[in-house]
């Protein structure tokens, strides 16, 4: 447990310091990160290329590689945006993100005056930012996000802290049906 806490606090401190950098500079870091991640480390490159080839059988290799590079660019942005969550203000987050149609959904739910379950899919854009949904809706409505616990306990603790900071509740995937 001491080792988990040591890793947790060390990584938290480092990531928090990085999160204090302006987002514009973090995006610059993201652009730099792309090259070693794609060309040197080749993080999961075979899996990604195989998945893209299976998803787009009509595309030739040149087009697949282009999509692959776009994914890596997106992935690097995801990394720095996730870091930024350690220090981003509510105002700054709300300026950078919107939920379209949310007012109508909340209004309909309030009219019916019944219990409801609002499901949203998080694997689009930066799904860590989507955990901020409670900022946009009434405080009377509780929010939760389903998550898969990470294998590394220190990182699991770190990401739970990150995801819970907006007022939502993280629901482990295995307990979803019982919890909802």
Task: Locate predicted features.
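Short, intrinsically disordered, charge-balanced linker/junction segments flanking boundaries
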Residues: 176-180
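Catalytic core of membrane glycerolipid acyltransferases/transacylases, capturing the structured
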Residues: 115-175
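Membrane-proximal helical "anchor" segments flanking the first transmembrane region
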Residues: 1-118, 125-126
């Amino acid at each position: 447990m001491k080792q988990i806490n040591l890793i947790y606090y060390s990584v938290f401190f480092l990531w928090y310091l990085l999160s204090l950098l302006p987002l514009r500079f973090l995006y610059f870091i993201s652009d730099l990160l792309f090259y070693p991640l794609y060309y040197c480390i080749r993080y999961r490159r075979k899996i990604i290329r195989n998945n893209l080839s299976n998803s787009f059988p009509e595309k030739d290799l040149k087009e697949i590689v282009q999509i692959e590079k776009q994914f890596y660019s997106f992935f690097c942005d995801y990394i720095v945006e996730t870091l930024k969550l350690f220090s981003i203000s509510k105002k700054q987050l709300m300026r950078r993100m919107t939920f379209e149609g949310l007012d109508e959904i909340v209004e309909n739910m309030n009219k019916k005056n019944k219990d409801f379950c609002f499901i949203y899919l998080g694997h689009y854009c930066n799904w860590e930012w989507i955990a901020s949904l409670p900022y946009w809706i009434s405080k009377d409505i509780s929010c939760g996000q389903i998550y898969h616990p990470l294998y590394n306990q220190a990182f699991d603790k770190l990401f739970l802290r990150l995801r819970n900071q907006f007022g939502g509740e993280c629901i482990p995937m295995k307990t979803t049906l019982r919890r909802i």
